Amino acid sequence: RQLEWLKSDLALVKDKEEKMIVFCAHIQFRHNADKDNPDKTKNMAAAMDCLTDLHEAHVMIGHTHYAQNFIHHDYITKGGTPVYEHIHGAACGAWWSCNLNLAGSPNGYSVYEVSGKTMKNWLAKGTGESPDLQMRVYDGNQIYGGAEGHPSGEYEYSWTEGGIGPKGAQAPGFSGLKGCFVASIWNSDEDNWKVELFQDGKKVGDFKQVPYEIGDVCAISFFYNDLGRKTATWSRSTPQYYWYIEAPGGDPTKVQNWEVRATQTIPGGGVVNEYKCSTLQTDYSGFRNVE
């Protein structure tokens, strides 16, 4: 019924190829094709096809309690850009327990700027935070918790190995992060962001995206070792947040005068945003228990 309503509603729109659609729903579209439920897969494809009749299409989603951008490369709008799915972190974050969403992004909201038939610009805005807070940069060698980690705690986590929390809650790691700067950029995507490392004002190289889902192990350690959480919900892993580059000398803590620059180019609108960070997140600074 909802699909038929969408089709009939859009049938009333004239000159659709000259208009943008903002489609709001609760459950995410990304990865929602279901081989065991062909009607669900068919309906999802039909809904996405409806959106491609417009000049530009943005899908606004909640539900997950973490932020993620997902580009539907199989569904291209009349303006030539793919349907763009914005999965928003919750204003309440991890259910009002702290000032973080499940994957470590700040509690907050997104701000969008519309110009005619195009989403001209957008950013993720942490509640009470500067708009410039768009990333954290970590030392890929750091261990959190366990016998040797800092901050201390019962459960040990690292970027390379992940970790296991209470009741066997497992957080994956990625061995390729050893010796690397690791940037968590919660509004990033694989197509429209470029992340670079500079030292003494000169470019060192480009970051690559971590090739599969991992979690922010600093945030996960905070959830289990500081907040005392007990279930697997708090070891959430997500794609697309995490970028890495080998540090000169293999030890990010010893690199001097470095800066990470993350550049976002808005699809369709062409606006360019640049964000910078030159400080390692080595503890739970900025993480707050709000219960």
Q: What feature does the model see in each segment?
A:
Residues R1-H86:
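His/acidic metal-ligating clusters that form di-metal
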Residues E4-A11, D74, G79-E291:
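Metal-dependent phosphoesterase/phosphodiesterase active-site architecture
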